[in-house]
Amino acid sequence: MAENSVFVGNKPVMNYVLAVLTQFNSGATEVSIKARGRAISRAVDVAEIVRKRFLPDVDVKDIKISTEQIDSEQGTANVSAIEIILAKK
């Protein structure tokens, strides 16, 4: 499953949409979209754009949310994370 993952960051949304479409077009039946922190809303946008505009035969199979502890100089910070799994019908 790791090879079919798209990690969402600060790039424009369409870059990640293209990455997901490329995964599906290369034969993947499931693609995982992962994001942390502020990129979570961008990951949701990616999943919705793929489903509504490009691949109507793709559904959300699972959504996992979690909290990760990040150690920094100021101590530990909690960062939210999401994983959206898209699968072909």
Curated annotation (Swiss-Prot):
Localization: Cytoplasm; Chromosome
CC terms in the record's Gene Ontology section: chromosome; cytoplasm
Keywords, ordered alphabetically: Chromosome, Cytoplasm, DNA condensation, DNA-binding
Pfam families associated with the record: Alba
GO molecular function annotation: double-stranded DNA binding; RNA binding
Record-level GO BP terms: chromosome condensation
Domain of life (superkingdom): Archaea
Signal peptide: none
Primary site of residence: cytoplasm
Function of the protein: Binds double-stranded DNA tightly but without sequence specificity. Involved in DNA compaction.
Family listed: Belongs to the histone-like Alba family.
Entries under HAMAP family matching the protein: AlbA
Name this polypeptide is given: DNA/RNA-binding protein Alba 1
Gene transcribed to yield this protein: albA1
